[in-house]
Amino acid sequence: MQLLTIGINHHTAPVALRERVAFPLEQIKPALVTFKNVFLGPHAPNAPEAAILSTCNRTELYCATDDRAAREGAIRWLSEYHRIPVDELAPHVYALPQSEAVRHAFRVASGLDSMVLGETQILGQMKDAVRTATEAGALGTYLNQLFQRTFAVAKEVRGTTEIGAQSVSMAAAAVRLAQRIFETVSDQRVLFIGAGEMIELCATHFAAQSPRELVIANRTAERGQRLAERFNGRAMPLSDLPTRMHEFDIIVSCTASTLPIIGLGAVERAVKARRHRPIFMVDLAVPRDIEPEVGKLKDVFLYTVDDLGAIVREGNASRQAAVAQAETIIETRVQNFMQWLDTRSVVPVIRHMHTQADALRRAEVEKAQKLLARGDDPAAVLEALSQALTNKLIHGPTSALNRVNGADRDSLIDLMRGFYQHAPRSNDQSGH
């Protein structure tokens, strides 16, 4: 079995492409089924394995397969599933085989490949991806072991290095940007759209600035109300957004919607109602919640996850010593995992040897039972049984020795000596 990771992320593709390749949560299980069966060889000797990790910053397919053409098949499947031409998608896709796939998984879970260096959210997202793949019946020995090692490495990296210390989060970056637009956040009305983890983090950072008003709009009113109460704010129905958008100076959105929930026309009307006072908007969703054209309006300052990334990277440079330490840990653990993977490669051979040997044994035992049933001498039957087993078991090694020459034969001879040097001696030879 070969490990392979196919994906795009914030390093290789802009948000405009990432949002088109993202998988809504409810689509991941059925997508895994088609991905496994169509492109990872359903009739291969070993059952293929797969997991899909889809976040704001990355979409990745983790595979274990015997299919040597899995790379091309996975890219083609991703293209067809999302209806994106291969020529448009392929230049942004990375394909990581074997140890590169292992190293990548370890780095992602440890926060080394994140826009926010050392952030912990990705670890939870990866665990969610594994849980979903397990529920879909898409995981097996190889990916299960990979992800368990991945989580252990992430824990080791975070526990022994300062990789997560003093990190500038996306939420903190949003506050910094707002402070560039407005003299003080405390005079502004802030609206958060959504009630997930990212909105909760953003609300925490903005609430620390004591805004004039803090409002949560969410599809599920009860969840929005609970979050609003935590920050002494209030909730409003998401359906009120078009008519009340003009009330807010700062709007932060991060929902799981597959289509934009804020369009150009709605924002144009809000700007007009505000008499062209500026609106600061942050779209942390992938796919995006706010139509990109909104950013072209004169009095609107619209930022996406990629825009916030520049601010985040300013805080990453100071922690390069921790990065080097983390990379050393990861490299050691990659080698350990590859050693385990190497041992797995002989398992099918050993299993086949056991099957063949057992078939020989059963055939000879059946012959012996027939001879005993017709009254043959038991001692003679046992002698014939042992001779037949001996001849058949050494037939393979003997044939191999006769087929090779030169250095190959010498190596095989040494190997055979090792096999048989500890063979038990008969009682008369041992003197007992």
UniProtKB/Swiss-Prot annotation:
Site annotation Important for activity: residues: H104
Alphabetical keyword list: NADP, Oxidoreductase, Porphyrin biosynthesis
Any one GO biological process: protoporphyrinogen IX biosynthetic process from glutamate
Catalytic activity of the protein: (S)-4-amino-5-oxopentanoate + tRNA(Glu) + NADP(+) = L-glutamyl-tRNA(Glu) + NADPH + H(+)
GO MF: glutamyl-tRNA reductase activity; NADP binding
Binding positions for NADP(+) per the UniProt entry: G194, A195, G196, E197, M198, I199
Keyword NADP: yes
Residues reported to bind substrate: T55, C56, N57, R58, S114, E119, T120, Q121, Q125
EC number: 1.2.1.70
Pfam families the UniProt entry points to: GlutR_dimer, GlutR_N, Shikimate_DH
Pathway: Porphyrin-containing compound metabolism; protoporphyrin-IX biosynthesis; 5-aminolevulinate from L-glutamyl-tRNA(Glu): step 1/2
Record function comment: Catalyzes the NADPH-dependent reduction of glutamyl-tRNA(Glu) to glutamate 1-semialdehyde (GSA).
Domain-related comment: Possesses an unusual extended V-shaped dimeric structure with each monomer consisting of three distinct domains arranged along a curved 'spinal' alpha-helix. The N-terminal catalytic domain specifically recognizes the glutamate moiety of the substrate. The second domain is the NADPH-binding domain, and the third C-terminal domain is responsible for dimerization.
Further comment: During catalysis, the active site Cys acts as a nucleophile attacking the alpha-carbonyl group of tRNA-bound glutamate with the formation of a thioester intermediate between enzyme and glutamate, and the concomitant release of tRNA(Glu). The thioester intermediate is finally reduced by direct hydride transfer from NADPH, to form the product GSA.
Quaternary context: Homodimer.
PANTHER family referenced in this protein's UniProt entry, alphabetically: GLUTAMYL-TRNA REDUCTASE (PTHR43013:SF1)
Record's protein name: Glutamyl-tRNA reductase
Species per Swiss-Prot/TrEMBL record: Burkholderia ambifaria (strain MC40-6)
Gene coding for it: hemA
